[in-house]
């Protein structure tokens, strides 16, 4: 009888004790045109709009041949994504949001469209 009680107790302790202490929050942004073709050399900025945390949670990189950039953050967060191409003013722009999940690479697709200075923003 004791063996029957010990086995479920041991299984419970083993299964409940398995937690990842320091999860990572990787994310990937893919930039394409309206036809779905990946675009390289696009500046991608990922930031949070929380006062006091902008510097800590700010990433910037340029897309490669495959139109991808990858980042990793330490905490769960929602990032604002801004993708731009060209000088000042931009020639193309795209934006969106991405919610990070622990230990899962979350992907966001940003569609780059021609920038219209008379209608700024995304």
What role is predicted for each listed range?
Residues 26, 41-43, 78-80:
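Exposed beta-strand and adjacent loop surfaces of beta-rich binding modules
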Residues 35-52:
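Short, ordered, surface-exposed loop/turn motifs in non-cytosolic proteins
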Residues 1-17:
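Sec-dependent bacterial lipoprotein signal peptides
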Residues 16-28, 32-35, 91-94, 104-122:
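Beta-strand-rich domain onsets/edges
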Residues 68-73, 109:
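Exposed aromatic-hydrophobic patches
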């Amino acid at each position: 009888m004791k063996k029957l009680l010990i086995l479920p107790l041991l299984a419970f302790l083993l299964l409940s004790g398995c937690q990842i202490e320091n999860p990572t929050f990787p994310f990937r942004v893919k930039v394409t045109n309206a036809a779905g073709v990946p675009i390289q050399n696009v500046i991608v900025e990922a930031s949070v709009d929380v006062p006091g945390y902008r510097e800590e949670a700010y990433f910037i990189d340029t897309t490669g041949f495959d139109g991808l950039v990858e980042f990793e953050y330490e905490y769960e967060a929602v990032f604002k994504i801004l993708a731009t191409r060209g000088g000042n003013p931009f020639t193309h722009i795209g934006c969106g949001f991405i919610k990070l999940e622990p230990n899962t690479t979350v992907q966001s697709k940003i569609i780059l469209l021609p920038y219209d200075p008379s209608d700024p923003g995304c």
